Amino acid sequence: MTPENEIKVDPPAAERVGRELSRWFGNSDFATRPKPAELHRDSGRHVDWARVLPFLLMHVACLAVIWVGFSWVALAVTLVLYVVRMFAITGFYHRYFSHRTFKTSRAGQFIFGLMGASAVQRGPIWWAAHHRHHHVHSDKPDDVHSPVQHGFFWSHMGWFMSHKHFAADLSRVKDLLKYPELRFLDRFDIAIPTLLGAGVFLLGVLLKHVAPGLGTSGWQMLVWGFFISTVAVYHGTYTINSLSHVFGRQRYKTGDASRNNVWLAIITLGEGWHNNHHHYPASVRQGFYWWEFDITFYLLKLMSFCGLIWDLKPVPAAVREGAGKRL
């Protein structure tokens, strides 16, 4: 019997499910990614339900707030973790790993990656690869999260649920692949969020024991501090892909639909100045003018004063006021 005539037997269902679930834990190993032929056949709209189940359960877990109740300390932890992790995404995953708008030490780079991984948006290599792809194809057919091309839902969250886009074009991030510690974060991208969730739970247990008057518990802190905070960071981040290419003002002619939106800038610590960013992605600052609120830039500037980062790339005046600016 020739190879062409051989009968192909699918592996047992349990093995297939196990293989799919194992892909949730990795992205760096080539064997975990769809083969080129699979990517060619896949339209990109096939949702990989086995892999996205944890993402969906994260939302369902927020409903447990009905049972765990409310306390001011739980709300405070939720807000702190929202700001810290949103900054980790905007300042580190976006402005550092994706665009290299400043420099840091190798140890600092790893710490930035750890902080970004705590936001449960996968590893820095995967995140940066997709974002660099977006800038090359912004609002063109190959832009996987363009609302202009694919509509609101797909640009907001549907794209990363797909089998096809679980993979990333690693040719765009060769500068990051040379660091084994970053590949480790991508390979085990669920590890840091798991540790954070456990830590938040234990904090609640401790506070219930030493300060019962605060009215919190391990389960309450887990629901508020981890699940609700994480989901809020999710959708705050996703609005930049979906809403900031639809609503707002275009200061510059960038060849795409990117907009500046003050409300999105507030909830994302400065990322809402998206038209500015697409006009000049190399700048560490996205609020080009003093009145454009950019908390991420202010925090990065503070870090530079402390010597943690350096060589912050500014917006050249000629770029800010030059060609492409609308009157």
For each predicted feature, which ranges?
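Short glycine- and Lys/Arg-enriched binding-loop motifs that mark or flank ligand-binding interfaces
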Residues: 147, 154, 244, 266-268
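Short amphipathic alpha-helical segments
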Residues: 234, 238, 242, 262-271, ...
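Non-catalytic, topology-defining segments of multipass membrane proteins
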Residues: 1-238, 283-327
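Interfacial helix-loop-helix junctions of multi-pass membrane proteins
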Residues: 243-248, 280-285
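Active-site-proximal inter-transmembrane loops
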Residues: 173-181, 250-273, 279-280
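A short, flexible low-complexity segment enriched in Lys/Arg and Gly/Pro that occurs
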Residues: 69, 246-252
